[in-house]
Amino acid sequence: MKVYIETMGCAMNSRDSEHLLSELSKLDYKETSDPKAADLILINTCSVREKPERKLFSEIGQFAKIKKPNAKIGVCGCTASHMGADILKKAPSVSFVLGARNVSKISQVIHKEKAVEVAIDYDESAYAFEFFEKKAQIRSLLNISIGCDKKCAYCIVPHTRGKEISIPMDLILKEAEKLASNGTKELMLLGQNVNNYGARFSSEHAKVDFSDLLDKLSEIQGIERIRFTSPHPLHMNDAFLERFAKNPKVCKSIHMPLQSGSSTVLKMMRRGYSKEWFLNRVEKLKALVPEVGISTDIIVGFPNESDKDFEDTMEVLEKVRFDTLYSFIYSPRPFTEAGAWKERVPLEVSSSRLERLQNRHKEILEEKAKLEVGKTHVVLVENRREIDNQIVGFEGRSDTGKFIEVACKEKRNPGELVRVEIVSHSKGRLIATAKGD
């Protein structure tokens, strides 16, 4: 039996897809890259914005046309969680609907016609998924918590993934050890509020926090680097930042989702912090780790966002000079506080703001890239670069999250750590040579 999975959205969905494959492998399903050859087609969905949701029904229609006569189509993930049985009504070709909090039930629903399993109070935190040896992966994803307790006015995730529960540490460490034995060098820890780990478990558990978990994972032989996403700025207190700075295996790059640089808008968003508080955290972090790479999320056009509010966002962009920017126009979502508000920023205004934000960020990246020339970094090799079947170098990321293209005559294998020197840059790209090459 063959299964094809299309994954939309975030890294959490990518990991959920791996867990789906893990469960299906117990039933002798093998993954295929060809939906026409599949006996089961799964669409793992995203609902953070409206666009991926619209895409879902287009995808269902396309798969229904090309699938084998008896092949089943299943819709999984966040859109499945909040639309439930409505998906079956809109798309009769769908055989079942499986919510984001119900991954472990896949082996049950594939045997039921028109099954709907979307309960967000279902607890998978202590579910020991079989280790799925898909292939040796240099960088691997690892869930450490599920759900979200925050009440951000724009976000549907608490409605689709339920309450926040931490996965027991022993299960996390056991899976990390298996990943390391399979060749993983870098872990990416996943959670909706990943740095709030330990706040709540579903059963009795020793008191631990996120920094404790990072320390334990750092002890695993073979694991060279640890990253994590997505943290919440509210949980970046001094103690966390200090331990982040001291742990040599924790990469010195961090995601700090700003959302808006306006304290007024942040209050409307129910983010729990102000512009000044956010900047204070950045200042503290840069004092501890001057070379730190910082990425962020920014929403423009949130209801009632004024010109002054947007200028505040631009001011934070200038002060922090983020290394990576994920920016979007506000998208109203069902089951959210802001989704019910009638006030809307005109699309042409939001589009203009987004363009200005993104263009300035591109300029900042060029300015920062110039300053990198002559500096050295240690890069984890991810891919070899070839021209006409001849190895000309490799690609990888630095400890600070910078993607670097390296010219190198010597063969370097994925997973190796190599010291490189930046020699040039182009449109924000960093180009280097291997030291000693």
Swiss-Prot record:
Residues 370-436 form the TRAM domain. Binds 2 [4Fe-4S] clusters. One cluster is coordinated with 3 cysteines and an exchangeable S-adenosyl-L-methionine. Its cofactor is [4Fe-4S] cluster. Signal peptide: none annotated. Gene3D superfamilies: Methylthiotransferase, N-terminal domain, tm_1862 like domain. PANTHER family: CDK5 REGULATORY SUBUNIT-ASSOCIATED PROTEIN 1 (PTHR43020), MITOCHONDRIAL TRNA METHYLTHIOTRANSFERASE CDK5RAP1 (PTHR43020:SF2). This is tRNA-2-methylthio-N(6)-dimethylallyladenosine synthase. It comes from Helicobacter pylori (strain Shi470). The lineage of its organism: Bacteria, Pseudomonadati, Campylobacterota, Epsilonproteobacteria, Campylobacterales. The gene is miaB.
